């Protein structure tokens, strides 16, 4: 009998549009001869299943099921592709743990740690991972322009500590830009991270592990035409994504080894993607860890899967079957 798979998308942040795109990508990637696929949209208290005829019906949160005509369909597995809360920060993972429903990505603790950029960076720093200097501001806290310049320097990045897709991010070059950038970041989240700028080559590396194997994908080099890899660059084509990256085999191996180590240190599950900046002297610096990476047809992970000579359908099957 085919397993019923929920591709869980939506969420409660500005990244909802990106999440819904990823859901369509994942729907196209998963083997439909092996699984019954449904996209589940979540936004606040609204949990709905998209039915084949285009209509939607509510999800019963008591057992994660829905009614389709005269049939009750109970989901066997959740492929979480919410970028942001509640799917990337551990909240939804906690629900599925209580329901005893396996899911595609990291558990509660790993998701919570990686969603908090400042906490994740400080945690990995304790294991010898290089990070940039940063400050954390919580709602109601303030910092002077002088402190930012003295402790972090210019240029710097001011961004929401929680969230992704570069919403609310500003590359700050002058003192006059600091406070407006902080206000912009606070409009997206309750915590703001002020991070030192690092110039260099931006790379990203995907990885997943199952009970039988460990797979680290070829690296992608990110060359943006904008000031930085912002939303416009990510989703409107203002970037060159080169897979495999134009770097030495030795540096490639070092980045892949570090990515695998970060996976294990954090206790990850499913597919992750780790972003880096390579600075002078081939120093590898962590930018962030993504535990629910984008999965549209043109996203980094599908590109890297193709470059590795793998079939994305087989990778999706690995992720699902590893939980049974």
Curated annotation (Swiss-Prot):
Domain of life: Bacteria
Keyword Signal attached: no
Protein location: Cytoplasm
Amino acids binding Mg(2+) 1: 275, 288
GO annotation, biological process: cell wall organization; peptidoglycan biosynthetic process; regulation of cell shape
Binding site for ATP: 149-204
ATP-grasp domain ranges (all copies): 121-321
One protein family per Pfam: Dala_Dala_lig_C
Example GO molecular function: D-alanine-D-alanine ligase activity
Name of the protein this chain belongs to: D-alanine--D-alanine ligase
Gene: ddl
């Amino acid at each position: 009998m085919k397993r019923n798979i929920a591709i869980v998308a939506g969420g409660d942040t500005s990244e909802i549009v990106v999440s819904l795109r990823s859901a369509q990508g994942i729907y196209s990637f998963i083997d439909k001869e092996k699984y019954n696929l449904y996209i589940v949209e979540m936004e606040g208290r609204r949990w709905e299943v998209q039915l084949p005829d285009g209509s939607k019906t509510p999800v019963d949160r008591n057992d994660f099921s829905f009614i389709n005509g005269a049939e009750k369909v109970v989901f066997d597995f959740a492929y979480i592709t919410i970028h942001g809360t509640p799917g990337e920060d551990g909240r939804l993972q906690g629900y599925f743990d209580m329901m005893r429903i396996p899911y595609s990505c990291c558990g509660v603790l790993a998701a919570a740690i990686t969603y908090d950029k400042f906490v994740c960076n400080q945690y990995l720093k304790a294991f010898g991972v290089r990070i940039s200097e940063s400050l954390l501001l919580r709602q109601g806290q303030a910092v002077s322009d002088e402190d930012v310049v003295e402790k972090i320097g210019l240029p710097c990045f001011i961004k929401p500590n929680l969230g992704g897709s570069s919403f609310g991010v500003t590359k700050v070059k002058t003192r006059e830009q600091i406070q407006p950038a902080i206000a912009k970041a606070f409009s997206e989240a309750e915590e703001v991270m002020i991070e030192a700028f690092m110039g260099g080559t931006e790379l990203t590396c995907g990885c997943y592990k199952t009970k039988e194997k460990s797979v680290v994908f070829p690296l992608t080099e990110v060359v943006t035409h904008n000031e930085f890899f912002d939303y416009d660059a990510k989703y409107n084509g203002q970037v060159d994504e080169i897979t495999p990256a134009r770097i030495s085999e030795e540096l490639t191996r070092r980045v892949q080894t570090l990515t695998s180590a970060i996976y294990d240190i954090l206790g990850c599950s499913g597919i992750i993607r780790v972003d880096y900046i390579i600075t002078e002297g081939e120093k590898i610096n962590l930018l962030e860890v993504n535990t629910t990476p984008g999965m549209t047809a043109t996203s980094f992970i599908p590109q890297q899967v193709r470059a590795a000579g793998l079939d994305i359908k087989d990778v999706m099957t690995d992720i699902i079957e590893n939980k049974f």
